[in-house]
Protein backbone atom coordinates (compact mmCIF):
# COMPACT_ATOMS: atom_id res chain seq x y z
CA UNK A 1 0.00 0.00 0.00
CA UNK A 2 1.26 3.45 -0.91
CA UNK A 3 1.90 5.31 2.39
CA UNK A 4 1.09 8.70 0.86
CA UNK A 5 -2.28 7.44 -0.42
CA UNK A 6 -3.05 5.85 2.95
CA UNK A 7 -2.28 9.11 4.76
CA UNK A 8 -4.45 11.10 2.35
CA UNK A 9 -7.31 8.65 2.82
CA UNK A 10 -7.07 9.03 6.61
CA UNK A 11 -7.04 12.83 6.31
CA UNK A 12 -10.26 12.58 4.29
CA UNK A 13 -11.79 10.29 6.96
CA UNK A 14 -10.91 12.84 9.65
CA UNK A 15 -12.39 15.65 7.57
CA UNK A 16 -15.65 13.74 7.11
CA UNK A 17 -15.88 12.99 10.85
CA UNK A 18 -15.41 16.66 11.71
CA UNK A 19 -17.89 17.85 9.07
CA UNK A 20 -20.48 15.35 10.35
CA UNK A 21 -19.99 16.87 13.82
CA UNK A 22 -20.85 20.32 12.45
CA UNK A 23 -17.39 21.77 11.85
CA UNK A 24 -16.26 23.81 8.87
CA UNK A 25 -12.99 22.13 7.87
CA UNK A 26 -10.08 23.69 6.01
CA UNK A 27 -7.49 21.40 4.44
CA UNK A 28 -4.37 22.70 2.77
CA UNK A 29 -3.70 21.39 -0.72
CA UNK A 30 -0.44 19.45 -0.97
CA UNK A 31 1.77 20.55 -3.85
CA UNK A 32 5.31 19.90 -4.92
CA UNK A 33 6.47 23.43 -4.10
CA UNK A 34 4.72 24.23 -0.83
CA UNK A 35 4.61 22.49 2.51
CA UNK A 36 1.56 20.30 2.86
CA UNK A 37 0.58 21.27 6.39
CA UNK A 38 -0.64 24.44 8.07
CA UNK A 39 2.36 25.98 9.85
CA UNK A 40 4.20 22.73 8.99
CA UNK A 41 2.26 21.11 11.87
CA UNK A 42 -1.47 20.62 11.21
CA UNK A 43 -3.25 18.74 8.42
CA UNK A 44 -6.72 20.11 9.18
CA UNK A 45 -8.14 23.17 10.89
CA UNK A 46 -11.79 22.95 11.94
CA UNK A 47 -14.13 25.61 13.31
CA UNK A 48 -17.63 25.79 14.73
CA UNK A 49 -19.42 28.02 17.23
CA UNK A 50 -17.60 26.30 20.12
CA UNK A 51 -14.09 27.07 18.88
CA UNK A 52 -11.22 25.82 16.77
CA UNK A 53 -9.58 22.40 16.44
CA UNK A 54 -6.09 22.07 14.94
CA UNK A 55 -5.62 18.44 13.89
CA UNK A 56 -2.54 16.45 12.88
CA UNK A 57 -3.54 13.10 11.31
CA UNK A 58 -1.20 10.11 11.74
CA UNK A 59 -1.39 6.50 10.57
CA UNK A 60 -0.49 3.57 12.87
CA UNK A 61 1.75 5.55 15.22
CA UNK A 62 1.88 8.62 17.43
CA UNK A 63 3.70 11.82 16.61
CA UNK A 64 7.48 12.05 16.94
CA UNK A 65 8.94 13.89 19.95
CA UNK A 66 10.06 16.69 17.62
CA UNK A 67 6.55 17.14 16.21
CA UNK A 68 5.01 16.99 19.68
CA UNK A 69 7.35 19.77 20.80
CA UNK A 70 6.34 21.89 17.78
CA UNK A 71 2.66 21.32 18.58
CA UNK A 72 3.14 22.23 22.25
CA UNK A 73 5.13 25.38 21.42
CA UNK A 74 2.66 26.64 18.81
CA UNK A 75 0.60 29.46 20.38
CA UNK A 76 -3.17 29.06 20.22
CA UNK A 77 -6.00 31.23 21.47
CA UNK A 78 -8.39 30.17 24.24
CA UNK A 79 -11.05 27.80 22.92
CA UNK A 80 -8.61 26.13 20.51
CA UNK A 81 -7.55 22.50 20.91
CA UNK A 82 -4.40 20.93 19.49
CA UNK A 83 -5.06 17.32 18.56
CA UNK A 84 -3.31 14.31 17.06
CA UNK A 85 -5.66 11.78 15.46
CA UNK A 86 -4.16 8.31 14.96
CA UNK A 87 -5.85 5.93 12.53
CA UNK A 88 -4.82 2.31 13.05
CA UNK A 89 -5.24 -0.35 10.37
CA UNK A 90 -8.50 -2.31 10.59
CA UNK A 91 -9.93 0.04 13.25
CA UNK A 92 -12.85 2.19 12.16
CA UNK A 93 -12.47 5.14 14.56
CA UNK A 94 -9.32 7.16 15.25
CA UNK A 95 -7.66 7.49 18.63
CA UNK A 96 -7.73 11.20 19.47
CA UNK A 97 -4.98 12.69 21.65
CA UNK A 98 -5.51 16.26 22.87
CA UNK A 99 -2.21 18.01 23.53
Regions found by a protein language model. Name each.
Residues 1-99:
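Catalytic phosphate/metal-binding cores of nucleic-acid and nucleotide-processing enzymes, i.e., regions
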